[in-house]
Amino acid sequence: MKALNAAEMREVDRLTTERFGVPSLKLMEAAGKHVAEAVLRAFVPDLPKKIAVLCGKGNNGGDGFVAARYLQKNVTRLCAYLFAAPEELRGDAAINFKRWQESGGQVTLIQEDAAWGAAWPEIANTDVIVDALLGTGLRGAATGQIAQAITDLNGLSRNAAAPRPALILAVDTPSGLPSDGERADGPLLRVHKTLTFTAPKIGQLISPDAAAVGLLEVRGIGSPAALIEEVGKGTLRWAEPEEFAGLPLVRAADSHKGSFGHVLLVAGSVGKSGAAVLAGRAALIAGSGLVTVAVPDGVLPAVTAGQAEYMTAPLRSTNAGTAALRNLEGQYFTEIASGKTVLAVGPGVGTQAETQEFIRTIVLQTELPVVLDADGLNAFAGKADSMRERKTKFLCVTPHPGEMARLLGLSSAKIQADRVQAAVEAARRWNAHVVLKGFHTIVAGPNGAVFVNTTGNAGLAKGGSGDVLTGILAALTAQFGTDEWLRVLALGVYLHGSAAEAATEKTDVSGLLAGEVAEAIPQARQRLVRELQRRG
């Protein structure tokens, strides 16, 4: 799904009304109803008892009044707070404010600091706070009572000992977050969940402050999907289930192991044999028909014992226990690579100069699609432009920000300041696909197209997670090929994050192990298939 900026979103709303005859009031009604449903879903089977709906004077506030109307029959106490004088409301927002009052809804006006101070103790003691203050129409920074409200809300404790509020839900976007990707220019509300409408907003995906969004959900309110594609002029897409509907995720009953490719993984060294095991296991669990793990002979027994289902191949070792250059002598490595579908290189191979030369040579000389990660990337530090001289048409590099900084000769801070630009520039420069890992991983193709992934959690911030991702990307390439490689790679990143979510449903993310992420890949894939089936 395309991500839109604020101007594009306004245009979609306008055309939905003018071209397709959907009244703007109906769009607001649908938006508010979705907000109410999201709140109630979050608390099934125990409904929240106290809800505070914070409304600004614009259409975002109007959405909030609609949501309040739908919610009021399901809770013990619900109060709406209007951060404006009623006469400042216009259009659909004014209509829904009146409907809220006519339904018997309670409204507290917040027009001065004293009013906010008096209301705050009650708001701080609610189960749910709905943020309908500013929305996507923000220009400049939040000020006045809204700025104070954001500051106070951000100070609320969210730990197990003081669980209120259980949910802070942003309507369309967190108050204070610009929609077009820039950093917030003032106070920014950090929420548990954001329910946005029609399409994700660019800022929710790529802003340096995007973590404020929490869990992002998108709900349609009546605008045709084709209109989003028509109006959106950018190449930024959100990696969501619909993007993968065209891939053969469900296997044919008469398929066999040869139908799903053969991954060759060059990985591991003394002290880093686990990286090879993790990547190899992930490739198997992610669906590759066959997997061969090529490792230095000194760690071959450990890697062989790590998983019964993959095959292994010994690589000649340096004195340091890493892959030696003499693996290139004769046909030794050529025979190992013969008959394989994809080559994945890098997890745990080490940074010995001789090993790095071996890595550079096999990457530049193979005609197989290549997934290059970890120490494999470090082999090209200071020599990254040589990747353009490779034989294979298909190269995917998977750096974290530090590795990308070394490849591009920039600081990590520079990379993080504009992650999309860094990934797009690298993809163009090396004529490669780039998976720039981190919060909201970027997947960029050499033609400028970009996916942003929002699945995953902080449990992935642990050693071995990248090795698992390498295995997943290689396995999906083996299964689905390179005709739609950007989409296939985006699927891999999506499943990696979704597996982390599945593995931590009943546990804290701090204890998540990379191997547990690998084990949850089938669950993530099943979830995706079922969601696509549900959508029809």
State what each model feature region is:
Residues 69-158, 163, 301, 306-317, ...:
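N-terminal small/polar loop signature for handling phosphorylated ligands or for N-terminal nucleophile
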Residues 127-128, 133-234:
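Internal gly/pro-rich beta-alpha loop/helix module
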Residues 1-85, 90, 94, 193, ...:
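Small-residue (G/A/S/T)-rich helix-start motifs and N-terminal tracts that mark the onset
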Residues 112-116, 173-179, 202, 376-379:
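Short acidic loop-to-helix transition motifs that present clustered carboxylates
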